[in-house]
């Protein structure tokens, strides 16, 4: 997160961290949506990851911190009417459910679609400088604005005319999600509306917002898989 502050210890109980098993390096964020499922970005998918829940400072362990492995992973595989931009979403089933605790609690799925003009909260352990990386020990939080999708199309002409993508940032620059914030939540008016997906190589430039996968448009898929319907039809 560029331009943010350390998150309040109580405001990110649903925020999880994905690590590479072999190198131990921090990869991505994710969001706990119930006791055994995490929603993240598809581009965070590595063959061997483990997931930390209930973490704040990466070098100080809480008593209720939990470590899990993916038992199952689901990628959004629809090709008709979808471009590669529309598919940066992944569901992970934990190898063992987690219990709610002081630092762990799920974030519910959105009950209504996001509204352009909303102020949204983003958070993560991603780099705090760009283009060179500086990774913080604690998650950073900051507020950004939800723009009309056409704003991002103006910046990234390759984007399709219509898509399941949200466009958000701060037009003056200086505030943004960045590398390794991927997979974390975009929370607008208290609702979980987006997943950190993609942005320019250099983060937080003026008039260059970033892209977020739109959770609301994938609800059918998410709910079907959680319900046990593993061969979900495309919407």
From Swiss-Prot:
Residues 1-227 form the Peptidase S1 domain. Pfam families: Trypsin. Its EC number is 3.4.21.-. The keyword Lipid metabolism does not apply. Glycans are attached at residues 45, 57, 81, 132, 148, 229. Disulfide bonds join 7-141, 28-44, 78-234, 120-188, 152-167, 178-203. The active site is at residues 43, 88, 182. Glycosylated. Signal peptide: none annotated. Keywords: Blood coagulation cascade activating toxin, Disulfide bond, Glycoprotein, Hemostasis impairing toxin, Hydrolase, Protease, Secreted, Serine protease, Toxin. One of its GO terms (cellular component) is secretory granule. Expressed by the venom gland. Not inhibited by hirudin. CDD domains: Tryp_SPc (cd00190). It is found in: Secreted. One of its GO terms (molecular function) is serine-type endopeptidase activity. GO terms for biological process: proteolysis. Thrombin-like snake venom serine protease that has coagulant activity by releasing fibrinopeptides A and B from fibrinogen alpha (FGA) and beta (FGB), with a preference for beta chain. Monomer. Belongs to the peptidase S1 family. Snake venom subfamily. This is Thrombin-like enzyme bilineobin. It comes from Agkistrodon bilineatus. The lineage of its organism: Eukaryota, Metazoa, Chordata, Craniata, Vertebrata.
